[in-house]
Amino acid sequence: MIASLNFPALHASHSAIWFAHPGKPAVRISKGEAIARAAETPLIMLNAPLIAQRLGYPELSGLDLLELFAFVHPAQFMVPTPMGLVRALKLELPLPFRGGGNAPELALQSPLPTLSPKGERAEQGLPESSIPALLHAAAEALIATLERPDWPQREGAWTGLQALARLRWPWAGVASRHLKAPEKAERWLFSRLPEWEEQPPRPQPRQITLAENDAEAQLEALTGAGAERREGQRQFARTAAHIFAPREKRAEPHMLLAEAGTGIGKTLGYLAPASLWSHAAGGTVWISTYTKALQRQLSRETERIYADEAEFRKRVVIRKGRENYLCLLNLEDALQGGFQNRAAVLAQLVARWAAYSRDGDMIGGDLPGWLTTLFRRAGVTALTDRRGECVYAGCPHYRKCFIEHAARSSQNADLVIANHALVMVNAARAREQQGRPTRIIFDEGHHLHDAADSMFAVALTGQETVEMRRWVMGPEGKSRGRRRGLAARLSDVASYDELGGRAIEAARIAAEALPGEGWLARIREGAPSGEIEQLLAAIRGTVYARDESGAEDAGYGLETELAELDGPLIAAAMEAARAIHALHQPLVALGRRLEILIEDPPDWLDGPARARIEGAIASLGWRIDLLAAWASLLGRIGGPADPDFVDWLALDRVEGREYDM
């Protein structure tokens, strides 16, 4: 036994609570005893928040093996259960203690057989009384790994552990005794990550026509010689092959709307001609799905096409929206004080993961899904780019960005597995001109309308306007973090260019009309501030007035059509439109000025400043378009209807609590 691990272990299930000192048999205790012992000394446990929930004691803390596993084995899959821990660490399975006296025996089995990742079968038959001993064995195995010279995740561990020790991470004291300082100073995380390289544009694909027989032969190669012959699948592949034929007229691509019943095997039915065409023509085929589950299935299916792993990673790229990937600039801010207390511990563990992650995908990638559940406030959303704040080339980590890595990999891939939302975003914002898809297969096509509606629809809401204010003005009051306003992001322009500086200042003044912190409380109290809050208050009153369900206290959102509106609401909409226009004008002027500075650069415009301006132009254009859409929407309140749009008023609620309108 490792002397520094002389801590008791605790396991709580729905049926019992088991407690054990190292080398001692487990004893069954009550909830009150468990809480008292947790207050006396740190306890080794697995999934502390879950144990706290079962004990009914939310303040429970201790030595959580999941956190230690995330530190020792970052980016490694592990089911967060006792048996999942056994399998991940290749432990021998402890059976119940037997014998008596002061020296009980611990019977061990041989290593477990390989099971499915979920490990349901392995959980059966494991006595709960043996789990505390299992937790002790797992803790010893993890701590012993820190001393192994062949530990593959050693780099960065010492630096990370010192930071965690300053944060009083419960495991820091034990781990520090077993992790030696490196002989040479460790490299900073952001200097260790690989950079992507600019690649020449992929040549235009060759114009070829796929023969039906070739598509069928490719299907047979993918399904294997012993597979069942399904005529429906073969017909699907033969028909799908025709959409890859050369165009006959400009702007009229070949299209096919195909439906296949359950059991036809449509996935391989379209993968066969798609992979055949991409290989023969030297082009890229995008396969768009609606769900992450189908993305994962497609990734597994395409492994049949490229048996070699290196070739597979080169030829097949999975693309997701920006909000799925770790933003390195957000992570740097979190590591340098943007996160506090337990959130700061999460940031350090995410940094450990980032150094070894395959692609930086935080949602459905190799970041353990259970890691973020160990921390009360969800910090993951703050580590991704969910607000469109990316400054692109103006970011100091641009060359190492996970999102840019994926974008450039997809430009030379044969198959890109994306989702409807990303395809719609690229279609709407048209940022990735070089890698824009020219051949697209929409699987789960019945969801395509929802994805398009989500992207191309516009919503003038309290939360959206708050985000716009923050984007222009930056953090206000006690707000922390790297979020900066226009003046800070474009400090060079604000300082050295008179016209640009005026536009930035005018935008800042105009943005004060948008809702700020506490807007929802002010509206509820009947004291809205500014033109937009006045409009939102009028909308709220109208929605409640027209609700005929009598369910004002129900937990569901409320809606009403935008028709037969009263005078005060129309007047509030006109005032709000003027406020939106007042912000739109200086942003348009700023956009024009930035383009002039790029075309005719002044002496002060060095490389970094140019990169910041180019990044700002992209995000500025998006905000200008959004403001114009808001103005158009407000113009239809009390004005003529537009047959191309369906407009309505809504109050968003969850469990009876209003959160937007």
Role assignments for model-derived ranges:
Residues F7-L93, E128-L146:
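Conserved DEDDh/DEDDy metal-dependent 3′-5′ exonuclease domain
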Residues G84-P94, R98, G125-L179:
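Acidic, Mg2+-coordinating catalytic module of metal-dependent nucleases/exonucleases
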Residues P205-A258, M661:
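Conserved pre-motif I regulatory segment
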Residues P205-E220, A281-V285, T289-D414, R470, ...:
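A substrate-engagement module of RecA-like helicase motors
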Residues A241-A245, T267-A281, E301-I305:
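Walker A/P-loop NTP-binding motif
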Residues K249-P273:
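Walker A/P-loop
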Residues H397-A407, A418-R436:
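Conserved RecA-like ASCE ATPase "motif II neighborhood" in helicase/translocase motors
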Residues R436-F456:
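SF2 helicase catalytic motif II
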